[in-house]
Amino acid sequence: MSTVNNEWKKSVLEKAGLQYITLTGEEWVLLLAGADSSSPILGEYTFHFIFFLYPFSPFNFKTLLIAPYSEQLDKCLKRMLDGGILIKEIKVVNTMVTEAYKLSLKGNTVYRNLKNKIYKKQVLINNHIVRPVANVLNELESLKKTYNGRELFKLLALLIAKVKNNDFALELRLQDHEIQYLKRVIRYGGV
């Protein structure tokens, strides 16, 4: 059934003359990491918060005890670190030890090539929404500038407000990879 829906959407987009693309999880992370002149992203949790707050996020999230979490995003970050696209460094920022994620030289090249290839196209998000890539880039940059480098507690206050407004159920049965993520957030997020 979803193949039929996707074919129908593709047909409509093509008839409208819209050149569209779909992005992989790694490409979404790449676009966020490259935003704001490729400034480092402070804290792994920042990736999760930004994509959680982004209304057109391609990732599925659940709310853990102290932060939103996406297993898909977690796996993308690991693959990008393992593949040499992202570099992780430990830094002291405002007297706190944190992880800083930035694009490697290879990652910067991949980012520039991707951005040039897709800039004038539309992106199909979650097989539902079509957005101009230029808008997506601007939105990700705005979110990065707004939330990157914020203390975890300030982001948690935002999350709590979002949770209260959207009636999320807190899931207390955690899997091992979720527990590992929480440990990293607590260690490097200043909790």
Where are the regions a protein language model picked out?
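Domain-edge interaction signal
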Residues: 2-191
